Structures are given as structure tokens and as C-alpha cells.
Amino acid sequence: MGLLDRLSILLGLKKKEVHVLCLGLDNSGKTTIINKLKPSNAQSQNILPTIGFSIEKFKSSSLSFTVFDMSGQGRYRNLWEHYYKEGQAIIFVIDSSDRLRMVVAKEELDTLLNHPDIKHRRIPILFFANKMDLRDAVTSVKVSQLLCLENIKDKPWHICASDAIKGEGLQEGVDWLQDQIQTVKT
């Protein structure tokens, strides 16, 4: 990054660009969350399951996010690790209404946290306990317990209850992530 780029970021003329990985099991709401974070005129009305991955962009008050929306289908999860080095933050989405798959989500999270490209970095992780509007949803506190998030000691993390369709809880999460990215060296 050149001197003019740094100066324009400091003056607020240009936003710092960050690469974020959006991970989680299939049907957890990753694509819907990313879609809802985009400006309303850029939002898609028809959300389809992600095949492989897609790249989406949105902006916050001080950052420009490039999000790698990774498919959560079992056959595509092995692709995740190819993007770990580039990621400056992680959004991990959990379907809080699907108790049966919470064990699989925990296994995938453990695999992620123990990967050499993630393990020794203080990369911030934002968890969305999504689908809180559904009858069978458990609280974000319960999701945190089921995933044993309290054991994550070497990375900043935060969990937000969310309803991606209504957009509830999303801004709180993005605000936290923005603060972490600006203060944490990964």
C-alpha cells in the first residue's frame, strides 16, 4: 500500500479493504446474511445455495469488505482451507434451530481452529446464531455452550443472535467485527 493510499484511508477518503471468510454448514443462512449486508439496491431477491464459493462486497462506516461466501455443503468444505491465509476475519454462521447438526458445526469449527493457517493467528471470529425467528431455535448462549466457544482463548470472538431475513442482529455483528479488524493484528 502506497503513501497516498494510506493517507486517503487516514483522511476517510478511501476505506480499508478487508477479506472475510463466511463459513458454516449448508442452509445456515450465510448467503442470506451477506446479501442483507449489501445496500438494498444491490440485494438479490432470489437466494440460491452456494456452489463452491462466491465473492460479495459490502461497506461499513470505515471498511470495505470483500467476503468469500463459502459453500457449507459437505463436498465443498475442503475448499475452505485454501482461503484461510487470505482471510483477515471469519464470519461463522450457525443454524440455531438445527440441534442435530450442531455437532457437525462444532467439528467443522474445531477443524478450522486447528488448521495451521488459522491456529496461531489472532484472527477475529464473528458467530451468527442465525434463524432465531424459528420455533426450535436455541439461544445464542446455548449455541455458544454447544460449540464450546468459551475454550477459544487466543482469538477475539463474539456471538450475535440473528434473523438474516429480517436483518436482526447483523449490524451489531458487523460493528464488532469492524472494531476488531481495526485493532487486532492477524
Swiss-Prot record:
Q: Which UniProt keywords apply?
A: Cell membrane, Cell projection, Cilium biogenesis/degradation, Cytoplasm, Cytoskeleton, GTP-binding, Lipoprotein, Magnesium, Membrane, Metal-binding, Myristate, Nucleotide-binding, Protein transport, Transport
N-myristoyl glycine: lipidated positions: 2
Q: How does it sit in the membrane?
A: Peripheral membrane protein
Subcellular location, in the record's words? Cell projection, Cilium membrane; Cytoplasm, Cytoskeleton, Cilium axoneme; Cytoplasm, Cytoskeleton, Cilium basal body
Q: Report whether Nucleus shows up as a keyword of the record.
A: no
GO biological process: any one?
Wnt signaling pathway
Which residues bind Mg(2+) per the record? Answer: 50
One Pfam family, short name please? Arf
Q: Does the keyword section mention Oxidoreductase?
A: no
Residues annotated for GTP binding in this entry: 24-31, 50, 69-73, 130-133, 164
**One Gene Ontology molecular-function label:** phospholipid binding
Q: Which family does it belong to?
A: Belongs to the small GTPase superfamily. Arf family.
Quote the subunit structure annotation.
Interacts with SEC61B, ARL6IP1, ARL6IP2, ARL6IP3, ARL6IP4 ARL6IP5 and ARL6IP6. Interacts (GTP-bound form) with the BBSome a complex that contains BBS1, BBS2, BBS4, BBS5, BBS7, BBS8/TTC8, BBS9 and BBIP10. Interacts (GTP-free form) with IFT27.
Name this protein carries in UniProt: ADP-ribosylation factor-like protein 6
The beginning of the lineage is:
Eukaryota, Metazoa, Chordata, Craniata, Vertebrata
